[in-house]
Amino acid sequence: MSELTDWGRPYFEASGSSADIFYVAYGKPPSSWDISGSKYSVSGIPDGIEIHTYGPTTHPETVEEFKKGYLWESLLERKPDLASKVAEQTECLIIRGSLNDPVTLNYFRNLVGLIQWLFDRGIQGVFDPHAFLWWSAEEWNDVFEKSDTALHSHVMIFTSPENGEEWAHTRGLRKFGRPDLSVRGYPVERTTDVGNLINRFIGMQALGAVIPEGQEIKMQGFPSEMYCKHKGHLDDPDFNNVHIEIIWSNSKSSN
């Protein structure tokens, strides 16, 4: 096998956190695991990651677990073709585990390639519960084929009104062993600016940066005295992760 490209973390600082992986792949499991390392950029299944299969005779309720509720209803509305394919499946694989504060992103490169291989073997759809993100084969392939790591594609930014202001927050950074992000109390006209700020922090953290408690944010056009505050817990339903609250200094709801 030719040498694979390293996915580095140039900003890495030890955090003591674990990268937590959770994917559900719907469709018939492959009969053999003959993955071409050079084609899919896979050197192996990362240590700490396990793959379990479920179907009609093995905990069939697990296959149906994510085919209900708000996220499923949203998928039916937004991506009916993908929802139809997933709904027909009676088997799935769950890819799950954790890695202690990885120094590189090679584990994630391996996972991206593994899931691409599963799609090429007939898997019909993949759900990322950490990011609340459903993937079709075409969408995953678009990311897989990109020349860069496309890490932002694996983290979602959600926005919603709150107390007459806006709230933006992420889901999905747990797969990189870093806190998710939240900005509350900004005016709606600043949504694009806040999105750019969040994307900057997503990239830094995915590449290994650790944002310290009280980190000040000084950017042109933003309020003075903005800073970062670590909050939450891994079972927080809004994030399924701990998070960093970016305090918008003159808001009513972020403090």
Question: What are these model-predicted stretches?
Answer:
Residues 1-27:
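N-terminal alpha-helical "arm" segments
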Residues 42-50, 113-127, 203-212:
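Structural alpha-beta junctions
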Residues 56-158:
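Internal, hydrophobic cores of structured domains that mediate oligomerization or house catalytic pockets
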Residues 18-83:
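N-terminal low-complexity, intrinsically disordered segments
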Residues 132-255:
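Aromatic/basic-lined ligand-recognition segments
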Residues 4-9, 35-43, 208-217:
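Short secondary-structure junctions
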Residues 15-18, 45-48, 87-89, 238-240:
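A short, structural micro-pattern
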Residues 25-28, 97-99, 185-188:
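Short beta-strand-to-loop capping motifs
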